[in-house]
């Protein structure tokens, strides 16, 4: 049992005679994506909330792709990759993930331009992960809502000093109406436990394919 938990050791002192053993758990930061994502997709197979929608077999994953994916489990792989991104870089939003999963759009004789990934796919995957309890919205702040006219412009009134002031929105009880803003999705405790357990389970495979990982 001890050998399974001892993953790193450090030599302390100039003579190297003192050795301190650090009992650590392999985390999502230690495993390459090409090994981690398929293993995480398999681990999430029992999550009923994570499943490919009916339209998933017809869509492209990004504007720079020419055809839909051919892998049968591409939705699970993409969802696993999104969960890994959230675990490593969260809180993140749909736009950041769309840029991360994008590529280069072929413009023919013109220079290539960045092509973002499908936001609809990413948004749906995040909603499924949220339903599964693996990610959550990270609260940022609340902002006051103000009245607008039929043209979408703010409604102003004069204060006692003659300055224009926006009219705050109120509910039926006269309470000020506010809207919560979120900085993106972050991983939950259950999601962190899942990704760390998957990372620990594939550490041996990762060290076999990438021998240099054993140094870290």
Q: Residues of each region from the PLM?
A:
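Short, amphipathic alpha-helical interaction segments positioned at domain boundaries
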Residues: 147-216
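Short acidic, hydrophobic short linear motifs in intrinsically disordered regions
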Residues: 92-113
